[in-house]
Amino acid sequence: MLQQKITEIILYEPRPLFRNAAKNSIQAVNGSLLVTEPDALIEEVPPFNDQTSLFAAGVSGAGEEIYSLLRIIHHLIMQGKEIIVWVAKRDDLLIRLMYELGVQTLLCENYLEEELAQRMLSKNFSSGYLPLRSPLINNMNRKNRLTHSELNILIDCARGLSAYEIASLRHMGYKTVFTHKQNIRLRLSLQKSASWLDLLNRLDQIYSI
């Protein structure tokens, strides 16, 4: 039972409707859990260092903090932390990105209250409304996840920077930037240019909310 180990939930969900649904779901399962809601995300200070805390976040409503949120998710996963993330049912590209970052528990926000309650009761719960990990991303060991550099370049691309601008910003060669972009597309199975642009556009849409 998850609530026997976790004493605090760090909840990041800017949208009131989904935030209230998440809080209701958590407290219905275990009313003694402390639910902390950060006003803002600070990349330099991860949401928690305590093993008894769990980070839970809605990605689709992150707005201008989407890129900070992606970096925090990546950082926490690389630290071996378990986190819970929810996305919209049909947001296939965002689902792929979450799996590639290494998110183990991905829930469907359309059924958040139902699924989060089940996840709080069972660590092994998986959404019945989202594609499974394996058909989308194979070989999900740590070596095959997005690296820190690749995530930075993905974010730079979503912000509209050219490869030359990224090379200057990140102090690397143009060919290195190109190689990173190719690796990202391969990891996410986005061989078609249109699919790659769709992902960048989706991240920009979230940022512009």
Predicted regions and their residues:
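Generic structural marker for isolated residues within well-ordered, non-membrane alpha-helices
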Residues: K23, A163, K181
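N-terminal regulatory/sensing modules of transcriptional regulators
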Residues: M1-R133
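DNA-binding alpha-helical recognition surfaces that contact promoter or target DNA
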Residues: N24, I155, S168, T179, ...
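Residues at alpha-helix boundaries and the short loops/turns that link adjacent helices
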Residues: N110, G160, R187-Q191
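Helix-turn-helix DNA-binding segment
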Residues: L136-T176
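Residues within the DNA-recognition helix of helix-turn-helix
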Residues: R119, H180-N183
